[in-house]
Design a protein with these regions (language model features):
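A conserved structural motif in NAD(P)-dependent oxidoreductases
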Residues: 208-219, 230
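Alpha-helical segment proximal to the catalytic Tyr-Lys
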Residues: 127, 169-173, 232
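Short, small/polar-rich loop/turn modules that mediate ligand/substrate recognition or access, typified
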Residues: 88, 172, 177, 234-236
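Substrate-binding pocket helix/loop in short-chain dehydrogenase/reductase
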Residues: 98-99, 103-111, 200-204
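Active-site helix of classical SDR
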Residues: 122, 156, 164
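Short C-terminal tail/terminal secondary-structure segment
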Residues: 1-4, 145, 224, 235-248
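Residue(s) in the substrate-gating loop at a strand-loop-helix junction
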Residues: 140
């Protein structure tokens, strides 16, 4: 892991930080000596992670589908810790639902958590962002690979890319950068337990240019770069972390 000295002491907000890629990012920013504030619905996992990391790691249970909860969380952190330097919108669900089974409610619920929440967190955080701050929104290579039974999810991830590009233009005059990370199939605990069979692993290795399995900490490394001053000239962009499943 690279060390970015400028991240020490900076306030970092991460949604969906209790497990998987989110947890890897919380841990990575904590190593950089940043003040890491993260939210999740998984209260047990979030509290456990915060306790393990100790100082400079603060967890809150927040339902990102509720605007009032987002407002309270962001305002509280800004009042307690000051300007926000890094915001990472990571929280999302990726259900596998056939087209004919996607109800209007299921569609609306998925958009509420996967993209409406991103917008609301960005809106509230924008009131407290430091000059030169960095926002990272998560999309997915499924926008390009278009897997079956994930049409609603893929639509939310397409929207995340559009949100990033628009906000990069809107916030650029404040020297605020906005970028997207689109991970490939990452070997989180949930993916390994729910979806990644031996056959899937073979498929992954076959599809990728580099036939190694993607790990959460590798995504966290890219998030660190986008949060650091080393990426000060990078905004409105999308970085795919997929070992070449989707060649550029």
């Amino acid at each position: 892991m690279a060390v970015y000295d400028e991240l020490a002491g900076r306030l970092v907000l991460i949604t969906g930080g209790a497990n998987g890629i989110g947890r890897a990012m919380v841990e990575a920013f904590h190593v950089q000596e940043a003040m890491v504030c993260f939210c999740d619905l998984d209260e047990k996992a979030g509290a456990r992670l915060s306790k393990r990391l100790g100082d400079r790691a603060e967890f809150a249970k927040v339902n990102l589908c509720r605007e009032a909860g987002i407002k309270r969380w962001v305002a509280h952190l800004a009042k307690r810790h000051g300007d926000i330097h890094v915001l990472i919108n990571n929280a999302a669900r990726d259900p596998r639902i056939a087209l004919e089974d996607v109800t209007a409610k299921a569609w609306d619920d998925l958009f509420a958590g996967n993209i409406r929440a991103y917008f609301l967190v960005c809106r509230e955080a924008s009131l407290h962002l430091a000059k030169g701050a960095s926002i990272v929104n998560f999309s997915s290579i499924t926008f390009y690979t278009a897997p079956v039974n994930m049409s609603a999810y893929v639509a939310t991830k397409a929207a995340a890319i559009g949100l990033t590009r628009s906000l990069a233009r809107e916030l650029g005059h404040r020297r605020i950068r906005v970028n997207t990370i689109s991970p490939g199939w990452i070997m989180t605990e949930r993916q390994l337990s729910d979806h990644v069979t031996p056959a899937v692993k073979r498929q992954i290795r076959m599809e990728q240019c580099i036939p190694d399995l993607n790990q959460p900490d590798e995504v966290a490394d890219v998030a660190l770069f986008l949060a650091s001053d080393s990426s000060r000239a990078v905004t409105g962009q999308e970085i795919l972390v997929d070992r070449g499943w989707v060649p550029g």
